[in-house]
């Protein structure tokens, strides 16, 4: 099963921009497990992920193994392509 962990923050402009794109992809791929984490509010869950300073971060898991990370703002098409090609 594919799981996408999205780490973002309410103060992050790029994260706010990506929120609508995330929603569209969540609707398109409902069989994927989507997990939204806030960099500040969920720090105990985010810290072990070592996401760095560039957010949003998308961590893609396949069968509970991390297979890819992508970070930053991008078009919906680019994000979808990145999420599909792991």
What do these predicted ranges mean?
Residues 14, 56, 62:
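Conserved coupling/switch loop of ABC ATPases
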Residues 59-86:
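Non-catalytic, surface beta->alpha helical segment in thiol-disulfide oxidoreductase systems
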